[in-house]
Amino acid sequence: MDNSSVCPPNATVCEGDSCVVPESNFNAILNTVMSTVLTILLAMVMFSMGCNVEVHKFLGHIKRPWGIFVGFLCQFGIMPLTGFILSVASGILPVQAVVVLIMGCCPGGTGSNILAYWIDGDMDLSVSMTTCSTLLALGMMPLCLFVYTKMWVDSGTIVIPYDSIGISLVALVIPVSFGMFVNHKWPQKAKIILKIGSITGVILIVLIAVIGGILYQSAWIIEPKLWIIGTIFPIAGYSLGFFLARLAGQPWYRCRTVALETGMQNTQLCSTIVQLSFSPEDLNLVFTFPLIYTVFQLVFAAVILGIYVTYRKCYGKNDAEFLEKTDNEMDSRPSFDETNKGFQPDEK
């Protein structure tokens, strides 16, 4: 009998009508390629973020760390706790809760630095908070995950991939450190790298969505609970960050800065950690959450920007600045012409 007429060309064992066809490894290859590309692009984004850090100003905030300390409490206190409360209250699956917590433990994103400039925030504080949260995430993310996932780990329903998370965070810190060095030695080149990195960050999000849509097609059947968490989480971060900063006696412009740094997470990092840490079966359940958070953190950031612009127009620029001077800290507020120039237009 001619087996070639009934067996596929790639069959390995044929006997009559019975054939053994090897499983397609296309998804496995694509998954490996995606993980590698995401890691490289994320390293480029974080390298560019480091190029936005001026070492002497960063050290200045370290010497007067009250603003950074408030930001630290927001970043690694409020956000993980909020993620835990939302996860327990909504009753989502343990693996989904872990991803929500990873998002809550992620450091601030570079987008907050741009928005801080647009809302007349403290640019030096914004960049310093982003840098500090990125460096501290190396220890704080595993610690927060250990504390908040204990109820699921002890019950045996989930295993936290600390090794993958640790490798991702180490790979994150090294490019930031190199970027800081480049900005210290070659500030003009660092400014160009920063702009390239901003574009790379957008490409990274699009790439995650497109390739992820191919690999994890069932992930796009999104539970309403994840939509609800993805909506509430960023607005809770913005609001709680603002009120905690105000409660700590920070001036209005720093309150706006802390609010943005708290609510705007590094979603590219979260997506990369999730991609590297979970099995394809788990990714089908959780892959879309970082994208949901990305959408709503940008939506609410745009709302905040719109409210602030309206406020400035209603009060007038001079009146608005006068109101902020009542904080008695305007004399110490850095001038935008003298602060971080990464987001300034090139001089002609």
Swiss-Prot record:
GO term, biological process aspect, one: response to bacterium
Gene3D superfamilies, A to Z: 1.20.1530.20
Primary location recorded for the protein, binned into one broad class: membrane
Mutation effect (residue 40 to T): In strain: NZB/BlNJ and C57BL/6
Catalytic reactions on record: taurocholate(out) + 2 Na(+)(out) = taurocholate(in) + 2 Na(+)(in); cholate(out) + 2 Na(+)(out) = cholate(in) + 2 Na(+)(in); taurochenodeoxycholate(out) + 2 Na(+)(out) = taurochenodeoxycholate(in) + 2 Na(+)(in); tauroursodeoxycholate(out) + 2 Na(+)(out) = tauroursodeoxycholate(in) + 2 Na(+)(in)
Annotated stretches, region: Disordered: 328-348
Entry keyword annotation includes Nuclease: no
Family membership noted in the UniProt record: Belongs to the bile acid:sodium symporter (BASS) (TC 2.A.28) family.
Subunit organization: Monomer and homodimer.
Role of this protein: Plays a critical role in the sodium-dependent reabsorption of bile acids from the lumen of the small intestine. Transports various bile acids, unconjugated or conjugated, such as cholate and taurocholate. Also responsible for bile acid transport in the renal proximal tubules, a salvage mechanism that helps conserve bile acids. Works collaboratively with the Na(+)-taurocholate cotransporting polypeptide (NTCP), the organic solute transporter (OST), and the bile salt export pump (BSEP), to ensure efficacious biological recycling of bile acids during enterohepatic circulation.
UniProt protein name: Ileal sodium/bile acid cotransporter
UniProt organism field: Mus musculus (Mouse)
